[in-house]
């Protein structure tokens, strides 16, 4: 496993269930010298994981960060939310091996963790493996390209532009509620 990634810029986020573990992971990474962008939340009050999954996905897509770490109670909801965006490959990992494989074979750019199902020490081992492991490329590239192509072919418009999203939603509503002669 290479350790060429100590200069990575890493986004971190969670919902309320992952807040405490997020804080511990963030501090650990800051102490190791990683650039950290904390996308919230700022406390453990109830929040909706889709909002934070979208926020971290946008940071990956926009190139503001190299990798992301996203936590919720199980890791499932936040990974599903983030994976709705083209170019995002969020992997739910629970140990070093799955974190390494997610990077080596799938070029995962977001590590999802189930905060209710892992202790701090194991979570840190997963995070370290995820951040230190490089993508192998080669035969895995064509598989990722197939995923992106399939995603485009079978999905509706994928946009991060909220004005465009709103305009499209309004037009769809207009068409559904208007009889045109």
Predicted features by range, described:
Residues 155-181:
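N-terminal glycine-rich, Lys/His-bearing helix-loop that initiates the first secondary-structure elements
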Residues 52-70, 74:
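Short, structured active-site "lid" loops
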Residues 70-71, 76-116:
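Mid-chain, well-packed structural core segment of small domains
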Residues 11-31:
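Glycine-rich phosphate/diphosphate-binding loop of Rossmann-like nucleotide-binding domains
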Residues 5, 11-18, 96-155:
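C-terminal binding/interaction regions
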Residues 9-10, 65-68, 87-89:
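Short active-site oxyanion
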Residues 1-9, 30-31, 56, 149-161:
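SAM-dependent methyltransferases
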Residues 35-46:
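A short beta-strand-loop structural module common to alpha/beta enzyme folds
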């Amino acid at each position: 496993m290479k350790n060429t990634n100590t200069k990575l810029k890493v986004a971190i986020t969670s919902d309320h269930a992952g807040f405490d573990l997020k804080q511990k992971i963030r501090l650990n990474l800051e102490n190791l010298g990683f650039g950290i962008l904390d996308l919230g939340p700022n406390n453990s009050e109830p929040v909706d994981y889709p909002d934070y999954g979208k926020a971290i996905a946008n940071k990956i897509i926009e190139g503001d960060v190299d990798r992301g770490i996203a936590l919720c109670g199980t890791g499932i909801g936040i990974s599903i939310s983030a994976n709705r965006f083209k170019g995002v490959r969020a992997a739910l990992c629970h140990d070093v091996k799955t974190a390494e494989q997610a990077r080596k074979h799938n070029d995962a750019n977001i590590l999802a963790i189930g905060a209710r199902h892992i202790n701090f020490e194991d979570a840190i081992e997963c995070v370290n493996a995820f951040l230190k492991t490089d993508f192998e490329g080669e035969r895995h590239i064509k598989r990722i390209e197939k995923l992106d192509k399939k995603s485009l072919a079978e999905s509706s418009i994928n946009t991060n532009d909220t004005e465009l999203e709103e305009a499209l939603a309004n037009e769809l509503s207009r068409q559904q509620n208007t009889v045109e002669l």
